[in-house]
Amino acid sequence: MNYLVTGGSGFIGSHLVEHLLKDGHFVINVDNFDDFYDYQVKIKNTLESVQQSTDFEFSDKENDIKKLVNQTKSENYILYYTDIRDKEALAQIFKNHKIDVLVHLAALAGVRPSIERPIDYEE
């Protein structure tokens, strides 16, 4: 089956991705690598979920994530570095892939930021 997992680079999402891949499924991971958590941790989560070495040379967020997208792409896995609030990007993903199951795990974390930026959390 083809799974789309939002938030697939987070703690819970990356573990789900790992199990889905082990069970032979195709996984599309959509994650925006929000700054609440260190993006380097999410890169390591992603690498572990696709059974790749976590030895990764970090430079800067944008280039590191682009490198991760290319490095992890396979016949069973693809990572999209995008925000689920970007309707056009999501529409393109749905257009390009036959998705059987969507697992929505993406969420903005943190109580304090939710008070400071409530609209971001509502969207």
What are these model-predicted stretches?
Residues M1-E123:
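N-terminal Rossmann-like NAD(P)+-binding domain of SDR-like oxidoreductases, especially those catalyzing
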